[in-house]
Amino acid sequence: MTKDNLPLKTKLAFGIGSTGEAATNWVFSGLVFFYYNQIIGLPGTLTGIGVFIAMMFDAISDPLVGSISDRFKSKYGRRHPFMFFAPIPTSIALICIFYPPDAMSTFGLFTWFLFSTIFLRLSITMFTVPHLALGAELSDDYIERSKVMSFNNIFNYGGWVIMHIFVWIIIFPNYGGDKVGQLVRESYLPIISFTVILVTVCILVSAIFTRDRIPLLKKPSSDLDEFNFKNLFLDIKGALSNKNYQNLLLGLLFLAVLIGTHETLSIYMATFFWELSPIQIGYLVLNNICLLYTSDAADDRM
């Protein structure tokens, strides 16, 4: 860790990693439920249960991966080995989710969906948690750390925009003929191919071009206990006993409900209620970007 100003290269490299994370999350929250329910034919109740179980597992895997990463010792540090490894299982999980075996029973399809989704959440967690921890360790200076996380947020939003434009303006309008593209299974092949490439490139670029900071990062404390589940649950219990953290979690819960509902159901509303064409849905995000800048300018004037 250093108090010196971080080079722009490091900030950009760190930030671009979140584009890969954003692409994965966009596909998961924006397409997976709709794809299994409308294309594959899995009942909505089972699809919802599968997503719910996967997200509950995610709540356990996040602190689990964080605890292991904190104690990990290697010549490549304690964050980068996870960052380098994560694209492999993430890519495999994305392919597994969108290409289940043919002629499966409803229960078999649900089981495949459940375990593939859990696999995806665990895989991207192996990047996300060490990556965020790395961002806090790149500098001792509060301002520098804030700048680093600003780059992270910008690239994260950029990932959502890239995926939205690619899917709704480039891919879906050009598939389906009389049908809208999101209801045609073949249209998802270029989407998953693009996502796998984007995720792999962004995560590896982030890991490769921040590895020169490894010698400057803090090493695991010598008095830190070896990983075990007892210490993990004690750490979780300690965090949950903090009143301020409880309030933060409550706020995040309501925010997650809002975002999850919007991302999962907006494709249904746009397709079946508003009956918008794919390209019309694609233009919605461009309007959001314009509104972001105009509202900021209006706020400055006020």
Predicted segments — roles?
Residues 2-295, 301:
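Membrane-embedded alpha-helical bundles of multi-pass transporters/translocases
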